[in-house]
Amino acid sequence: VLYPFVLLDIPAGNGLPDPEGGDEQPPLPWRGRITCIPARGRAGSPNGTAAIRDDIDALCGTTIPADIHVADNSVSWSGGDDGYRRMILHHAALAQAAGGVDGFLIGSELRGLTPLTDDTGAYPFVKALCDLAADVKAILGSETVVTYAADWSEYWGYQSGGPGDVAFHLDAL
């Protein structure tokens, strides 16, 4: 199984805005903290608005499988951004160049992104992961298991409000 891993190289004293309202982002945060600014539930958050789609699109980027090239056991790229899609598709191409893999994770524990909703109630990051999974499958072939490794808190769905208000937001994935 190939598991591209997101590490956040954010030093102490970074001065970057903290989505949760602190003075700045904490150093070396866990990838589950990646979210919108301000975070869901905070005043001014883009969560629940059309603007969240633009934020998710900017994070994911526009790289498509045709932008990644495998030749002579090397991988190159001709796209125009370095978003999340580029990283994952590049790793899929590396796996292809190495002869394939049995399984491939398109992400893990991105619990600050998966429950974000747009103005229609859709989950744009989950949709982006679904699209990415299809593109990775196109690169690696139908025999490769392509999946997302949810954080334990994502397994039971997203409780978005009142009692009994649970959305199983990862079901599409």
Residue ranges: model-predicted function:
Residues 1-121, 145, 152:
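Substrate-binding cleft and catalytic face of glycoside hydrolase catalytic domains
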Residues 109-111, 115-173:
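Extracellular glycoside hydrolase catalytic/binding regions
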